């Protein structure tokens, strides 16, 4: 279960002319680290440091970060669902989803390839391919999650190596910020392609952090777009790993979700801190509550007088019958009238009927 929180920082996106072309009202990140594998995969102790480093840089960029360590297959599926259901409903949010762990590419019988991310309880496919397929999360499921998000911008990063055939791979040329930047988009970046492996010391993570520290601003406009990040990671990771890793970048194959660009803002002037709230310490409803209480008491008093008047009327009717009763003596009749006058001697403030009855009874 995710708590609904926001850092209270809004991110403004402006074009080269200073015109605002977009706004992120909330920024949320899901960072998943899988290191303690139990079913035949090599453990990845360096993932713990990777997660901490990624969390830190994302928080510096205004993200509220949810961290999940060593999820099994059920937990992995649930945390993606919960995160998206909790934070992915608002159009003005930006969502970043980062997975660090093993990846795998399975050659399908029809000739294509399917990429997977591997939870800690998934068997090694070399030993148990059926068990692996049942436990691992394939890219088709990631695509389902991506389309379930209603927030305009979502960026999926995988510090894993697998086939990215489900999204449109590209070597895009970063474009300047424009109104198109704010259009909906789902972007994906992986640390490597099929048949490659990610070392425990992650060059991908190191370069991701370096990019967000400013090195990824390819066109030096004060922003890093998802496209710029993809280009930067492709260049630097290939270089620093001596071509043992080839990061993949692309957008989802959906014309409704491939026009915009995820944005990181480098300048602090683009972060808008909401105004301080006004003083609410003295706020109360005491005057309203006092008036309500007075009205309630008056209503109770009026109800009692109404009941009192009904009893007075009934007593008068009874005494009137006694007065006409030939079996009663004059003294008993007089006692009946006197008893009414003595008992109902108060003046009813809500009626004049009591005064009329009292005058007849005397």
Regions found by a protein language model. Give the residues of each.
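Cysteine endopeptidase catalytic domains of the caspase/legumain-like
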Residues: 2-324, 335-349, 353-361
């Amino acid at each position: 279960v995710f708590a609904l929180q926001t850092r209270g920082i809004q991110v403004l996106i402006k074009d080269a002319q200073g015109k605002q072309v977009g706004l992120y009202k909330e920024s949320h990140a899901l960072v998943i680290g899988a290191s303690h594998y139990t079913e035949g995969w090599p453990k990845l102790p360096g993932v713990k440091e990777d997660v901490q480093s990624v969390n830190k840089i994302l928080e510096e960029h205004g993200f509220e970060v949810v961290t999940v360590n060593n999820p099994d297959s059920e937990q992995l599926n649930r945390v993606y669902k919960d995160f998206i259901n909790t934070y992915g409903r608002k159009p003005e949010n930006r969502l970043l989803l980062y997975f660090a762990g093993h990846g795998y590419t399975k050659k399908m019988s029809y000739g294509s390839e399917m990429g997977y991310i591997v939870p800690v309880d998934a068997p090694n496919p070399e030993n148990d391919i059926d068990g692996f397929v049942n436990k691992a999360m394939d890219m088709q499921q990631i695509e389902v999650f991506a389309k379930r998000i209603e927030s305009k911008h979502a960026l999926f990063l995988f510090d894993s190596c697998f086939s990215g055939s489900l999204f449109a791979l590209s070597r895009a040329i970063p474009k300047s910020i424009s109104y198109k930047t704010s259009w909906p988009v789902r972007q994906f970046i992986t640390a490597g392609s099929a048949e490659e492996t990610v070392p425990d010391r992650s060059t991908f993570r190191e370069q991701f952090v370096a990019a967000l520290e400013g090195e990824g601003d390819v066109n030096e406009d004060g922003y890093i777009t998802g496209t710029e990040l993809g280009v930067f990671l492709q260049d630097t990771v290939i270089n620093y790993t001596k071509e043992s890793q080839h990061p993949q970048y692309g957008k989802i194959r959906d014309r409704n979700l491939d026009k915009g660009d995820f944005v990181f803002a480098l300048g602090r002037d683009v972060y808008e801190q909401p105004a301080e709230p006004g003083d609410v310490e003295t706020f109360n409803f005491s005057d309203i509550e006092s008036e309500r209480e007075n009205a309630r008491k008056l209503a109770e008093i009026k109800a009692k007088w109404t009941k009192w008047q009904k009893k007075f009327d009934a007593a008068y009717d009874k005494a009137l019958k006694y007065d006409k009763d030939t079996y009663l003596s004059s003294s008993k009749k007089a006692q009946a009238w006197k008893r009414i006058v003595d008992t109902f001697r108060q003046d009813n403030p809500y009626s004049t009927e009591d005064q009329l009855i009292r005058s007849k009874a005397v």
